[in-house]
């Protein structure tokens, strides 16, 4: 059907090429219209309005540093340092007035009150001063030193801000005092009106002349928008919609002040009343300060100002790398006239408009003092200055603090989003999840498959490298965006949340939705979990100092290289481990199922099979070592699932075509285990702890129907074998053989009961006895004969396949009994087995039976037992064949009845296998089709996915088409570009949603983004688990986490360090470290619980893990919001 549909699709495409060309033009035209509309809507948007609303309760704070020693105009005194105030990610503006005999403290606050009044409280001497805080929220800050002044050292503390206070010493030396936390209570600023921000003035008084210089640099910080300021080209002051707040501390009473104004600035002129003060006393913003406060309230508006002379004393320099605002310097001087608070002045009209944006931090840098000529007027000059930028301003040992996330402006303000428009962002974020899954499954993973084929990479290594990258590409790009664009820990949160989602949610869901108890293959899970525990331990140790150095990133990458190397030699390592486990007493579970297989011939056949594997898509087999869903043919893409399966969990198959392909795959798997080389499935067939799922026999439409019937067959065989064992003990004359056989059968029964898997236990015993008593080739032959019986084919057929007999099959019951007798007798003696093997190649089955009767055993009772056993097995086999016949399975049951020669059977089966594999390959490799579906529901889904699929179909060649296979490099690069775009949209809209709701990007990454990027794997894992292959889903979920931890995290960190001169990457977060520790504990719980349940997962354990995931989410969110404190301190 797939071929017909595909041919029909090609014909339809040939019939209507013009429509597709027109659709491409329409699509491009639509994109142009949308882009122009977006630009048009964005123009009238006024960012300051949003900023004023957001920051109405959060005034900006500026860090101020005073003049250096050589620029001081004060004799016998040191420059005081202003302590920075920390409030909501902004620095408080404080200034110091330096005088010959006294330093007046002037706190000027700009409020909308119409009258302008001056309040002069009496001077009071204080011995302690604590930085003021206006808010309860805290944020860490790192203020680099100024180039021209003495360096001051700031220590960055995760989760808590520290404010550095400086105590001046004689001779101009600066002392670094102990940090003061911003939690200390002090004077509280009156919150300024909407959009408050401050500039820091400095006034130096010389002989009744005041020299004040202002230089303001506005830099961006988190969650602020740009502001537009209007300024005069000649001598106009900054014009913004915000107010100015000035705080100056002094020990003198002042009657006049100098105010730098917003808009048309009103400059007030006054004369100082100087009181006596001990000479050399320097007031300062240090814990010991003599202070007096004077508050001047003015009203914003156009106020005339007299503009005379100018001077420059100070400037503000921005050390940050990303600044888009020029510094604004205001130089002013007071006059000598005694005037009230208000003074007549001339009107200044702004003639130029400058747009500035607020950054996180502003640092005042001292400028050379300029000799000033006394002037009776006040001069205010506004001129821009280009700030210095780049990481060179930072000390080499400290990382550069990131500015605000680099996202484009949103069409909707925060208020609009809170009124309901955030629904669009949520829908867009969910839609991008689907888009990422489609890009990865339909284009990126097939391109990686072509690359692995071109490079001749083995399946295990490809599954651990390229295919893991295909499945984890969204997490990798999210981590890159978090480091370089959003400047947050969203990437770490996404990867940690995705890891917990895969460990707990995916595995628990697989256990809940599987039809039977989920039996796990122990080696892939044990191997991957061991590496994962090692990687997580390294990550926890590296997180302890809240910085990731370049060599730590390199160590994580080397851990991934070690994992790839292990996957390269996976089979050899697996065999060595199981050899060590097999040296235990015989009474224990035999861990060495197929260790006798790898002979020289088997190795040669294995190499041939490896070359064959590179040409075919990997078949997802139970017990496979690679255990990757991304390189398996059962992995269904989201696009096909949504269009071809409306209820994937209900019927456990995407469609009728998929059902047929899966039934054919089940037959191929059973035939492959019997016919392929012994070493091909060697790691897959290690029965010691390799547990085969035992589904209910009445499960329909599932590829586990064959094992369901095998269960009945094997139970019947075991009952018959035990009865045969008793008969042998009574009648056989060879006592030693009887004793060995009885002990072996008893051990077999115990092992089977322990593992609750009759098929694997029987295979173990047969292989172990064959290993101990026969040569390696005979052990392979016998083991394969046993395996054939377990895969739903009768032992007669299996014996014929392995030993190449040409015999005419008689009655099925008698034939099975005789073949079972051969199988048992072969295991009872080396000489007997070898002679039987030589004669069986030439004789019919009857002659073989006569031969065994002449081997010295008492045959009558034994023959009766074996005949009865054969009847029991025949009944079970008849039922199994009937079930398979009803479901369309024609593997071993049909070939038992009518074929006359084994060679013809093998040829037919090989042809069927090749045809099935070709059909599966063609079906799996079917390119993306834009064919219009039939049903209404599928048409709606088709239209829903069309905005994603159509641009991809236009821009990326599909390598699943033979003619486009040569363009795999373009597909690879194009897929990466699309994944990066979709990941950027996902993180941006998640940031907008989090900003609207009020949660951080780290929490969004832990919860929403982690689940969204992992849902495609969840759907595939559940579907595969319902088909009886849940162990692959579990192993793949752990294996994909290794790629995230060892590649998704360190690659962006290493790139950041290389770009920024090997600086470490700050990764501190409130609850992220504790979340990683929780992930580690959850992993240990999952592994120990699974191991204690003998590598089986029932629904109760799955439900417990399901609940643990939500417990992890709640704890992580509470840790991130500091509702609870992390018991593990960093």
UniProtKB/Swiss-Prot annotation:
It is a multi-pass membrane protein. Residues 703-715, 766-782, 802-820, 870-880, 896-928 have a biased composition (Acidic residues). Alpha- repeats lie at residues 461-501, 1010-1041. Residues 104-209, 274-295, 598-619, 650-932 are annotated as: Disordered. Glycans are attached at residues 176, 273. Keywords: Antiport, Calcium, Calcium transport, Cell membrane, Glycoprotein, Ion transport, Membrane, Phosphoprotein, Repeat, Sensory transduction, Signal, Symport, Transmembrane, Transmembrane helix, Transport, Vision. The modification Phosphothreonine is found at residue 690. The modification Phosphoserine is found at residue 625. GO terms for cellular component: plasma membrane. Residues 1-419, 486-489, 552, 960-966, 1024-1041, 1092-1099 are extracellular. GO terms for biological process: intracellular calcium ion homeostasis; visual perception. It is found in: Cell membrane. Residues 125-136, 286-295, 661-675 have a biased composition (Polar residues). The uncleaved signal sequence is required for efficient membrane targeting and proper membrane integration and topology. The keyword Transmembrane applies. It catalyses: Ca(2+)(out) + K(+)(out) + 4 Na(+)(in) = Ca(2+)(in) + K(+)(in) + 4 Na(+)(out). Calcium, potassium:sodium antiporter that transports 1 Ca(2+) and 1 K(+) in exchange for 4 Na(+). Critical component of the visual transduction cascade, controlling the calcium concentration of outer segments during light and darkness. Light causes a rapid lowering of cytosolic free calcium in the outer segment of both retinal rod and cone photoreceptors and the light-induced lowering of calcium is caused by extrusion via this protein which plays a key role in the process of light adaptation. This is Sodium/potassium/calcium exchanger 1. The lineage of its organism: Eukaryota, Metazoa, Chordata, Craniata, Vertebrata.
